[in-house]
């Protein structure tokens, strides 16, 4: 029978539940157990697909095309599992489903209430994931903070699950913050109150994960255990660490993995975390620093590009390179020009995005990389920007643009996909999820992947306009990846360049620690080689003494 672990948060938001859940999943998987994960988000949006990145951060796209919370990216990277749309549930989805059933008459004229109808729908979604995944353990993170009014139906649903599946098949983990005051003393009172608030909705925490910026001694653990009525072994200190990939080892060294297995009666094998320990050891080693510019629209909020950031670090780690990300606002490039902002970097990355703001800065960055031989990686919109830049400055064609930014442009080298023309709703209507791409032999993309066909995740409405394909190819643009039906250009590149590759898809969503994505691996390697070549040119000549 599937076991369930429910993870709640207290004291403050953004306390680290997502990394905690991902780390717990890693500990269980290292013991030979199959794990699936779910995020319950209490907002009324159906999904984050139409939310501003400033509000929500990155939209993570699953293989089956769901637009989900960025925490699903952490889950996939830590546990090395591909999740589905079943793994992200919002209040908006729950209420939409219940109201649709009421309109169909499924409730036979009954009065629709939060209890039981909303809570039953929540439990049904959790059960669907368990049945679909057939996982030994399903870990469910409840978004928000205990005490938020939006979270109450979810808390009530997971309270009811204790009776539905049996007390021995459930664990409740509460993640809290231990703040410290000017004297340096860690304060436990907020955690005590948070545990009490959880009890007020009928849930008693089995395990307390205590976040803090400084060490938590045994006296504090015993105090929390006393007030929370848990075993002192169940009070787990989680100090702030240099890398999120250290967290599974912190939890393992505190005995959490064995404690979970013991409490849930899981048929686990001894933990195998040797590869993970080797990964963390590589993270701690001194590495050559390579500056890479990320030119984007939302650079003030790094979480808007979290999968891109992690994919860069995965590739750097494999090659003993410390990626020094230079966050460059595309609007700044428009105002000040690319030369001043990009002259000190050895790689330029333009990630995905939407909207006209900053677009000319992204196009200028793509062209600057082309002219100056700086390795370039374009993702989704970054590929479209590279195409526009090439058409403008290599072909010398005037009034070139995407119809997203100028519907009346004379030369729409990027245009709305035909099947998008009659769509009026924004949410969930793009080309989303995993699609195949055929790679052209003899190209950088083919060499990077080492195969003829790949499958990658997409999120876009606009595409390369095939009306311009022949003229662009004649001018030197290489189409190195294309859909099997030959209609959609997936990858473009340049031949006589250290690395100039751009994809319509989002390779960052499939990068993993220890298994970097091939395009990021190639990009980072080219950036490092460019740095080394530059250093070699600057070395002083040494006269021979012979």
UniProtKB/Swiss-Prot annotation:
Which InterPro entries does the record associate with it?
Answer: Class_I_gatase-like (IPR029062), CTP_synthase (IPR004468), CTP_synthase_N (IPR017456), GATASE (IPR017926), GATase1_CTP_Synthase (IPR033828), P-loop_NTPase (IPR027417)
Described by its record, this protein's role is as follows: Catalyzes the ATP-dependent amination of UTP to CTP with either L-glutamine or ammonia as the source of nitrogen. Regulates intracellular CTP levels through interactions with the four ribonucleotide triphosphates.
Q: What is its EC number?
A: 6.3.4.2
Quote the catalytic activity from the record: UTP + L-glutamine + ATP + H2O = CTP + L-glutamate + ADP + phosphate + 2 H(+); L-glutamine + H2O = L-glutamate + NH4(+); UTP + NH4(+) + ATP = CTP + ADP + phosphate + 2 H(+)
Domain Glutamine amidotransferase type-1: from-to ranges: 291-533
Q: What is this protein called?
A: CTP synthase
Which domain of life, per UniProt? Bacteria
Q: EC class of this enzyme?
A: ligase
The UniProt note on how this protein's activity is regulated states: Allosterically activated by GTP, when glutamine is the substrate; GTP has no effect on the reaction when ammonia is the substrate. The allosteric effector GTP functions by stabilizing the protein conformation that binds the tetrahedral intermediate(s) formed during glutamine hydrolysis. Inhibited by the product CTP, via allosteric rather than competitive inhibition.
| NCBIfam families, alphabetized | PRK05380.1 (NF003792), PyrG (TIGR00337)
Which residues are annotated as active site?
380 (nucleophile), 506, 508
């Amino acid at each position: 029978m599937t076991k369930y672990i429910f993870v709640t948060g207290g004291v403050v938001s953004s306390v680290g539940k997502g990394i905690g859940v991902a780390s717990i999943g890693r500990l269980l998987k290292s013991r030979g157990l199959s794990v699936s994960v779910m995020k319950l988000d209490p907002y009324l949006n159906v999904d984050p697909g139409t939310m501003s990145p400033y509000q929500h951060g990155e939209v993570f796209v699953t293989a089956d095309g769901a637009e989900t919370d960025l925490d699903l990216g952490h889950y996939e990277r830590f546990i090395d599992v591909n999740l589905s749309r079943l793994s992200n549930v919002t209040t908006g989805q729950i209420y939409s489903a219940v109201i649709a059933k009421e309109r169909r008459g499924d409730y036979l004229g009954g009065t629709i209430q939060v209890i039981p109808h909303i809570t039953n729908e929540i439990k049904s979604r959790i059960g669907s994931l368990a049945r679909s995944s057939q996982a030994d353990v399903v870990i469910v993170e409840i978004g928000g903070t205990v005490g938020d009014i939006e979270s109450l139906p979810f808390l009530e649903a997971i309270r009811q699950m204790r009776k539905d599946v049996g007390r021995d098949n459930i664990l409740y983990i509460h993640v809290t913050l231990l703040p410290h005051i000017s004297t340096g003393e860690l304060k436990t009172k907020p955690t005590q109150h948070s545990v009490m608030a959880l009890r007020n909705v009928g849930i008693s925490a089995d395990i307390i994960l205590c976040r803090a910026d400084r060490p938590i001694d045994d006296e504090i653990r015993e105090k929390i255990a006393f007030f929370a009525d848990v075993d002192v072994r169940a009070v787990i200190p989680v100090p702030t660490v240099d890398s999120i990939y250290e967290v599974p080892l912190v939890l393992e060294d505190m005995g959490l993995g064995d404690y979970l297995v013991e409490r849930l009666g899981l048929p686990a094998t001894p933990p195998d975390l040797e590869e993970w320990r080797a990964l963390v050891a590589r993270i701690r080693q001194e590495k050559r620093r390579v500056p890479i510019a990320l030119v984007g629209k939302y650079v003030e909020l790094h979480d808007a590009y979290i999968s891109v950031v992690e994919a860069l670090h995965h590739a750097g780690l494999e090659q003993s390179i410390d990626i020094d990300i230079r966050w460059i606002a595309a609007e700044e490039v428009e105002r000040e020009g690319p030369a001043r902002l990009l002259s000190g970097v050895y790689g330029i990355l333009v990630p995905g995005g939407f909207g006209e703001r900053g677009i000319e800065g992204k196009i200028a960055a793509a062209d600057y990389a082309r002219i100056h031989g700086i390795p370039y990686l374009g993702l989704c919109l970054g590929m479209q920007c590279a195409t526009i830049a090439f058409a403008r400055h290599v072909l010398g064609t005037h009034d070139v643009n995407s119809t997203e930014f100028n519907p009346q442009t004379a030369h729409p080298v990027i245009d709305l996909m035909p099947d998008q023309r009659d769509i009026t709703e924004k949410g969930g209507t793009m080309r989303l999820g995993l699609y195949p791409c055929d790679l052209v032999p003899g190209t950088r993309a083919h060499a990077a992947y080492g195969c003829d066909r790949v499958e990658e995740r997409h999120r876009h409405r606009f595409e390369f306009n095939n009306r311009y394909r022949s003229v662009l190819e004649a001018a030197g643009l290489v189409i190195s990846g294309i859909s099997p039906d030959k209609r959609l250009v997936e990858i473009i590149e340049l031949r006589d360049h250290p690395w100039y590759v751009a994809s319509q898809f989002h390779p960052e969503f499939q990068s993993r620690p220890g298994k970097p994505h091939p395009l990021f691996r190639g990009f980072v390697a080219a950036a490092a080689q460019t740095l080394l070549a530059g250093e070699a040119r600057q070395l002083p000549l040494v006269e021979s003494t012979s």
